[in-house]
């Protein structure tokens, strides 16, 4: 809503400046008794267009369905493959009636509650699990999230991140139950084989996601004086990011990291490190994990730097070390 308001206001002010509209028009769009810009939260996992869906549609006669990859490496097609589960939560601040979206399952509520639903989803119940699966899924050669959910280590990884580590600080919006929400994510949404989502898609722009998806949970532990030793698998996700940046899978074969605005910069930081090299200098990690713009806080100042550094050393031990390290920490929780 705020983004829409900013865009509309910018156009209106420029139009008034250029004499296209009267000055009163700007006052009109800023009058909250007449015009509002409701906040909203939508949650419906929508992967890239998948060739299996494309082939199914072609068999049904819809043949002109080619996927286009844009210059920004986004994917578009004349069809959308998405999941059945969906949530739409809207701020109820309409001034002259509103569409009865509640008849289709949408929720109308306050701005505060919309924000709380978004916080619940993005910092605890869905997005952190997605990112954990994307980082380790890429290194373990997975191309489907649903296939990852059949992997005992990965499934337990996200279950324990969600229920054990993130839930103690979850935001409960009231209109949706966090435990029911995350249960649907783990047991229904992510294992769905008919939703061909890929860890490579989710790994896009990971540097822009870590601060919200994990940094906020760490901050809440600190702010509330909670036992930081309860955080083990979230640090393992962040340790895995350093290993992911080397663009080598667990068999030491190269893979192409997903598009990310900070990819080159962060890869340069870990460039001195080699997978499988004994007794190397890991001091470059202080530069990586003190990046507040990436992690939301200086992880060394927060008391997690040395813990993460130790995990990174295990992940860099050599071929098979990603699986071995993941299994070790997940099974111990």
Residues covered by each model-derived region:
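Substrate/ligand-engaging "lid" and interaction regions
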Residues: 1-333
């Amino acid at each position: 809503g705020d983004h829409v308001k900013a865009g509309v206001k910018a156009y209106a002010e420029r139009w008034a400046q250029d004499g296209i509209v009267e000055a009163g028009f700007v006052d009109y769009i800023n009058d909250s008794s007449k015009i509002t810009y409701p906040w909203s939260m939508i949650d419906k996992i929508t992967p890239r267009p998948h060739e299996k869906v494309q082939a199914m549609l072609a068999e049904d006669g819809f043949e002109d369905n080619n996927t286009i990859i844009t210059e920004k490496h986004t994917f578009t097609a004349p069809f959308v493959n998405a999941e059945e589960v969906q949530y739409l939560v809207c701020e109820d601040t309409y001034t002259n009636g509103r569409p009865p979206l509640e008849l289709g399952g949408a929720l109308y509520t306050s701005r505060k509650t919309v924000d709380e639903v978004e916080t619940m989803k993005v910092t605890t119940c869905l997005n952190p699990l997605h990112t954990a699966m994307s980082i380790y899924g890429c290194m373990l050669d997975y191309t489907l999230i649903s296939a990852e959910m059949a992997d005992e280590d990965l499934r337990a990884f996200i279950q324990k991140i969600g229920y054990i580590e993130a839930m103690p600080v979850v935001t409960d919006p009231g209109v949706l139950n966090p435990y029911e929400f995350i249960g649907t994510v783990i047991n229904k949404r992510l294992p769905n084989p008919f939703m061909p989502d890929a860890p490579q898609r989710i790994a896009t722009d990971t540097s822009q996601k870590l601060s919200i998806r994990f940094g906020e949970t760490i901050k809440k532990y600190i702010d509330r004086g909670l036992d930081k030793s309860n955080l083990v698998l979230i640090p393992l996700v962040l340790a895995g990011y350093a290993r992911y940046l080397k663009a080598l899978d667990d068999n030491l074969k190269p893979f192409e990291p997903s598009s990310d605005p900070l990819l080159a910069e962060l890869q340069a930081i870990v460039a001195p490190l080699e997978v499988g090299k004994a007794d190397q200098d890991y001091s470059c990690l202080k530069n990586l994990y003190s990046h507040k713009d990436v992690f939301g806080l200086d992880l060394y100042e927060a008391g997690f730097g040395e813990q993460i550094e130790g995990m990174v050393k295990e992940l860099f031990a050599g071929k098979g070390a990603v699986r071995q390290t993941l299994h070790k920490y997940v099974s111990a929780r």
